[in-house]
From Swiss-Prot:
One of its GO terms (molecular function) is phosphorelay response regulator activity. SMART domains: REC, Trans_reg_C. The keyword Transport does not apply. This is Probable transcriptional regulator ycf27. CDD domains: REC_OmpR (cd17574), trans_reg_C (cd00383). Residues 76-94, 135-236 bind DNA. Its main location: plastid. The modification 4-aspartylphosphate is found at D56. PANTHER family: OMPR SUBFAMILY, REGULATOR OF RPOS.
Length: 243
């Protein structure tokens, strides 16, 4: 099975949720390790190097937000947050500090499984064809985007992007000057079709994160622009240099 080598760390202080997810994810071919609190999660992460982390928000001592912040200091590992918080602003807090996606409790295990597959697909090192040659370096002013190594440089310094952030940037750059709707971005980058009713603010938060990392003035961007009434577009003219 294609997922056998993928290792997932499940972090939740509820033993029942850990057991359910460990059982379900093991059945569909993942290797699963678990942690019951944030401090344990960081220890296990640094020992096991999982392919993805499923991270509960509400935990004693070090909560999911704190774990996410610590992980982002040292890793681009995909993170899916589990949140029981009702307010939308609470749900997207994890995205703002570096998570790739979130699922609201109570959740369907099948829904979480689908999101895990989608996030892992996009975090894969194999570059999909989005209209930009994967053997080239894209030069846009002070930016260089290596579509083969999935790396970005700003003023010749490496900028750390998560897998989802890179895929979003790659999509926008693939058709520079053409606007993408939030719905189309969700489908192309996250694999979510419109009937799944995913909150489009997932896109907005990731755009904000990209701007913060790539723009000289994130509040007045000149690379990643907002297309009013539509979504977003990448502005600059691209010069393609073959590797």
């Amino acid at each position: 099975m294609e997922n056998q080598k993928e290792k997932i760390l499940v972090v939740d202080d509820e033993a029942s949720i850990r057991r359910i997810l460990e059982t379900r994810l093991t059945i569909i071919g993942y290797e699963v390790i678990t942690a019951s609190n944030g401090e344990e999660a960081l220890i296990i992460f640094r020992k096991e190097y999982p392919s993805l982390v499923v991270l509960d928000v509400m935990m004693p001592k070090l909560d999911g937000y704190g774990v996410c912040q610590e992980l982002r200091k040292e890793s681009d590992v995909p993170i899916i947050m589990l949140t029981a918080l009702g307010e939308v602003c609470d749900r997207i807090t994890g995205l703002e500090i570096g998570a790739d996606d979130y699922v609201v409790k109570p959740f369907s295990p099948k829904e979480l499984e689908a999101r895990i597959r989608s996030v892992l697909r996009r975090a894969d090192k194999i570059t999909t064809n989005l209209g930009v040659p994967n053997s080239g370096i894209i030069s846009i002013g002070f930016l260089k985007i290596d579509t083969n190594k999935r790396q970005v440089y700003k003023n010749n310094e490496r900028v750390r992007l998560t897998g989802m952030e890179f895929s979003l940037l790659e999509l926008l750059v693939s058709k520079a000057g053409e606007p993408f709707s939030r719905a189309s971005i969700l489908q192309e980058v996250w694999g979510y079709t419109p009937e799944r009713h995913v909150d489009t603010r997932v896109v907005d938060v990731h755009i904000s994160r990209l701007r913060a990392k790539l723009e000289d003035d994130p509040s007045n961007p000149d690379l990643i622009l907002t297309a009013r009434g539509t979504g977003y577009l990448f502005q600059r003219i691209i010069e393609m240099n073959k590797l």
